[in-house]
Amino acid sequence: EKHWEGIVEHVLSGGINKANLLLCHRGFAPGIDNPNGYRNIPDFDMAMRMKEKTRLPMIFDPSHTGGSVEKVIKIAQEADAYEFDGLVIEVHPNPKKALSDVNQQLTWKQFRKLLKNLYKRRIKSVKMSLRAKL
């Protein structure tokens, strides 16, 4: 976390307006211990602490964290439990012809399905929250 704080401080001291800055969590290099087989291991709690400490928007990159279509979808759904301000998801009409990151590119159909699932989860969560308040 100190590393993130130092980077934010350094960038802001260089004259960047805070309103033009956001943070992006892409996970951390897994090293040897990688039980989920992700390309990078996410630390969602750390990302939320940094969002709170810096008061900057925090987005999440499930594409580079997951490393494969199946894992991108899975980790995007996991990230939905946190208050990220957005997601960076690589989408290509023909992933096999993508110029980079071929294995983690979703098709438009997969992307639409993921968004629908995330939307349904959010609606269900809001409904449950409203019921609890009644």
List where the protein language model places each region.
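Catalytic alpha/beta core domains of metabolic enzymes, predominantly
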Residues: 1-91
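C-terminal helical cap(s) of enzyme catalytic domains, especially alpha/beta-barrels
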Residues: 93-127
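Divalent-metal-activated hydrolytic enzyme cores
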Residues: 127-134
